[in-house]
Design a protein with these regions (language model features):
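N-terminal targeting leaders
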Residues: 1-33, 43-46, 50-229
Length: 229
């Protein structure tokens, strides 16, 4: 079964800044493009940091503020440094949170959620920038046509699991919801089919209406079929 990856949905036309670009140039870029952040790259297109609107606003926030105090915490000291920054290299947050291009879409979504970010720079094996992926990009998988989703379920799930001709399973898809009907030999087969179907890109939900001849949950012990996380 093919797993959709970040490089399937990312935006490849990426606007960047260099570490030496001026504060005003960065502001102009964000305002003119209506971006909330921009990646900073070196001469080899490796991502070295990210400058966000929040980083730029430190200059306004600390304008005319009193001198740093001895007991100021590290976060406040860092903010003061950004308030006096003149270049993207001094403004940027580093190290950047990036995602490899071959990362699965669920893994990228978990990373965004865990880091509290709305978009991620996408890098290749050498750390070079190859794209940007946003929350909206990740949601593109749910715009897949129903017939494409059904084809993946049939080829990637049913033909791989249902090898016995006596196990007849049918699938239909409407608005991303997959309905599985038919009869198989045991409960564990229905569990595996259902779990794999939920992993198909674009599946909104699975209506599992499969019937089975033998309930093997007690034998398995956990009520979860082996081999599926």
């Amino acid at each position: 079964m093919r797993t959709w990856q970040v490089n399937d949905v990312m935006t490849t036309a990426v606007v960047t800044v260099g570490q030496g670009d001026s504060y005003r140039d960065v502001v102009d870029l964000l305002v003119s493009h209506r971006f909330s952040a921009v990646p900073v790259v070196d001469d080899f297109q490796r991502v070295t940091g990210v400058v966000s609107e929040a980083d730029l606003l430190r200059k306004i926030e600390y304008a005319g503020a009193e001198e740093p105090r001895l007991f100021d915490g590290r976060r406040r000291r860092d903010e003061r440094v950004k308030a006096s920054a003149r270049t993207a290299g001094d403004l940027m947050s580093a190290p950047p949170v990036v995602v490899p291009s071959g990362t699965s879409i669920p893994a990228a979504a978990r990373l965004m959620d865990g880091e509290g970010v709305k978009r991620l720079p996408v890098v290749d094996d050498l750390g070079r920038l190859v794209g940007i992926v946003s929350r909206g990009d990740l949601l593109k998988v749910h715009l897949r046509p129903d017939d494409e989703i059904q084809a993946d379920v049939e080829a990637g799930v049913l033909r791989g699991v249902i090898t016995d001709e006596t196990n007849a399973v049918r699938s239909t898809v409407q608005d991303g919801v997959v309905t599985l009907t038919g009869r198989v030999d045991r409960w564990s087969t229905t569990d595996i089919v259902g779990r794999l179907t939920r992993q198909v890109a674009g599946v909104v939900d699975v209506a599992d209406e499969l019937e089975f001849d033998y309930d093997d949950r007690n034998i398995l012990g956990t009520g979860v079929a082996f081999g599926i996380a």
